[in-house]
A protein has these predicted regions:
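Short beta-strand-loop/turn "lid" adjacent to the catalytic site in phosphate-handling enzymes
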Residues: 60-94, 122-126, 157-179, 204-210
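A conserved helix-loop-beta module that forms one wall/lid of the active-site cleft
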Residues: 194-208
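Active-site core segments that coordinate phosphate-bearing ligands/cofactors
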Residues: 3-4, 107-119, 130-165, 176-192, ...
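Short alpha-helix plus adjacent loop in nuclease-associated cores
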Residues: 92, 96-109, 422
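Short loop/turn motifs at secondary-structure junctions
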Residues: 65, 198-201, 380
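N-terminal glycine/serine-rich phosphate-binding loop of ATP-dependent small-molecule kinases
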Residues: 1-90, 117, 217-226, 401-408, ...
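A generic structural motif
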Residues: 29-30, 94, 196
Length: 475
């Protein structure tokens, strides 16, 4: 039996798989987010307790020897820990917006673009560079007390294994300090962000991913591998490894990723290049800030349950009777496929005749257009896999296939945890049939007439977005 652990933003999960990649059992626990005035934080002890809880539940539901385990989790943010991996302060989430003024300044003075040209990382307020700079100005004592600024999975790995020092991997380190060519930190970028005196906080990069034996949570001595983080782990779990092939993650965030061997640091600075376990191979990532969270907000506001979405999507035609949604709901603006810290969502075309069904369809269409924009910018030329919570809605998957104008290889289940196991197996030299492990649950084909309609609507979406970005810059 193999165990994958996925420490997500709102949910912590552990899944068990057999030798053929069949999912045997899943355990999950929600974790909270504290939101106030653009600040988004998480309690590290709550997160770690949730990890122990799901591992305990999984052991009772799928008893048996564990051959090995893989660990993945949310990326970005700043998780300040002491030498034992325990929190110095609450974790600043990747959704945090407190450092938006720093990003605005770096956009204006050229620092933002310089960093992208060096590392392929388009910074956003919730990534480590701006957050560390903000903390250095406003909470220097917290940085003084910390041994390292790590990422979510790194904190969990250190606690589960009892390792004496924190480390990270090349995937998490990719934003914004890692040089994707040398796979080492770029000290010039550290200097540009005013963090040279905090350089020692950057966790050492373990390349390939770190391994150790578990001391708690898993049976003692279980082999455990740390990484990659959730985006590349999902790509592994969906079988996206050939250049040109892509993955769309329809989760809390909306992420488009395309495998590539071409490191192109020209063009509009946006997204990032995620370094993988294979030097010379990257994932061109366009991780938008908000995916299913946008739909969740609309459902909560309208009093509609998730179970009603499929029926409501059938009640109104493509175009939602003229209702349109620009789905940029994050308090920190947008980070891909462009960076606009002050951009906010827009709802237009609403009248007294508009229905809940119109609002729901318009939101799903808007998210679909944002996904198309991300995948186009990432350079998708091959097949497209889709995973994440959004795949639980067959009607939304059909709508997405139409909006994107291409077949969708839908991968259900715990794809991130699956990818973490595959990464661990590769690290330990355990032979698993990756083709069998990554077979799609189903393939959804687009309707030609609706796909043609949405191709035209996508151009309208881009025009409305351009106007919204202009307004955001004036505010």
């Amino acid at each position: 039996m193999y165990v994958g652990i996925d420490v997500g933003t709102s949910m912590v999960k552990a899944a068990a798989f057999d030798d053929e990649g069949r999912q045997l059992a899943v355990a999950a626990r929600p974790v909270g987010l504290a939101l106030h005035g653009g600040v988004v934080e998480q309690d590290m002890e709550e997160v770690y307790s949730a990890v122990l809880a799901v591992l305990g539940e999984l052991a009772s539901r799928a008893p048996g020897p564990v051959a090995l385990a893989g660990l993945t989790g949310q990326g970005d943010g700043v998780w300040l820990v002491d030498g034992d991996g325990r929190p110095v302060r609450a974790a600043a989430s990747w959704m945090d917006g407190r450092a938006h003024e720093l990003v605005d300044r770096w956009l204006a003075d050229g620092t933002f673009e310089t960093v992208f040209r060096r590392t392929g990382s388009a910074m956003f307020p919730g990534c480590p560079g701006p957050l560390l700079a903000w903390l250095d100005s406003h909470e220097p004592k917290a940085l003084d007390a910390a041994r390292a600024a790590v990422y979510c999975k790194d904190m969990v790995f250190q606690r589960l294994t009892g390792r004496s020092r924190p480390t990270t991997d090349v995937s998490d380190a990719s934003m914004p300090f890692l040089d994707p060519r040398t796979r080492a930190y770029d000290n010039r970028v550290v200097e540009l962000l005013g963090l040279t005196h905090r350089r020692g906080l950057l966790a050492p990069v373990s390349d390939p991913v770190a391994t150790a034996e578990a001391r708690e949570g898993l049976p003692a001595g279980t082999r455990l591998a740390n990484g990659p983080y959730d985006l590349p782990s999902c790509a592994l779990g969906a079988g996206v490894t050939s250049p040109g092939d892509g993955l769309l993650i329809v989760g809390t965030c909306l992420a488009g990723l395309v495998a590539t061997t071409d490191l192109d640091l020209t063009g509009e600075p946006a997204g990032l290049y995620i370094s993988t376990d294979r030097p010379g191979y990257w994932l061109r990532a366009m991780p938008a800030m908000v995916g299913t969270a946008a739909l969740d907000w609309v459902l909560t506001t309208t009093g509609v349950a998730h179970e009603e979405v499929d029926a409501l999507l059938a009640e109104t035609p493509p175009g939602a009777h003229g209702v349109r949604v620009l789905p940029y709901f994050a308090p920190s603006g947008e980070r891909a496929p462009f960076v606009e810290p002050r951009l906010r969502a827009e709802l237009t075309g609403v009248s007294l005749e508009s229905t809940k069904a119109d609002l729901i369809r318009a939101t799903c269409e808007g998210i679909g257009f944002a996904a198309r924009h991300c995948l186009k910018a990432a350079g998708l030329t091959g097949t497209l896999a889709v995973c994440g919570g959004g795949t639980r809605s067959p009607a939304w998957m059909r709508l997405l296939a139409d909006v994107l104008g291409r077949p969708l290889r839908v991968i259900e289940g715990e794809v991130g945890a699956r990818g973490a196991v595959l990464a661990a197996a590769a690290r330990y030299g355990v032979a698993l049939d990756t083709t069998t492990w990554t077979e799609p649950t189903t393939v959804v084909e687009p309707d030609p007439s609706r796909a043609a309609y949405y191709a035209k609507e996508f151009e309208d979406h881009l025009e409305r977005l351009a106007q919204a970005r202009k307004r955001a810059r004036r505010d």
